Amino acid sequence: MSIQTSDISKLFGKQRALDKVSISVNKGELIGFLGPNGAGKSTLMKIITGYLPADEGEFFINGDKIISGNLDYKKDIGYLPEHNPLYPDLYIKEYLEISAGFYGLKNVKKRVTEMIELTGLGIEQHKKIRALSKGYRQRVGLAQALIHDPSILILDEPTTGLDPNQLEEIRKLIREISREKTVILSSHIMQEVEAVCNRVIIINRGKIVADGGIAEVKSGNLGQKQIVIAEFKESVSKEQLLAIEGIEDVAILGNTWELEAGPETEIRPAVYAFAVANKLTLLTLMQKQQNLESVFHQLTQQQN
């Protein structure tokens, strides 16, 4: 199933939590929402899942406009909130059977058994939820979100508080689930989104500041500064490099220079021409591949 939002806005008093947010999520995508705390990630997820109404804008599932109050589409969405709402005095099977009952599923016991197997809860299935570790509680939350076989899975900070082993196990599980479903997960951990997702949407102060494939966002083609690495055999001064058209700032790291340019500026031909004109030996000239963390900081700090 596909999801589209058009100019979605949400206000809490005078605070504009979302400001004309438009996204398009295609069937089968695994997308990461990235943003600082309070950026609007959870608010957008709650609007998509029907837990919050938008104040402005439109929302579509498979091209059909969702009318406020019509929540029939929720049967196609599985949702794991940031604070996983479990009942600690219930056994795992009890909790999942009750969850399945809300959707009027047939063969409830069979479906619960399938979810326990899928989420790796087999060894813990006879325990009460209060006796489970954080990692296994997250698995129970995932099993609940998947119990009715939704087409879309929404995961809000699904790995918060997990240890490194639990973290990798949940990431692996999410990747497996995404083979058959559209998955949106939110995080403020860049490494997590980079490890799991194939597309990232960066949200800051209620606005979309980047949207693209992981490689595309890291390449510097979405509005952030570009960095070129240059190394000369001969000595070159900072002033000489700043005089090259398009270069906005420079920094020296050992024997190499980092040359900063605007997002739409290709400075490598100008640097090469500078080397030729000054009879310099150019040992290195390449675009610096940024990591997602540096792009994130650059985009969110620009907005702030």
Language-model features: where?
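Short coil/loop linkers at secondary-structure junctions
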Residues: 106, 122, 247-248, 281
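ABC transporter nucleotide-binding domain
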Residues: 171-262
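C-terminal coupling/interaction segments
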Residues: 263-304
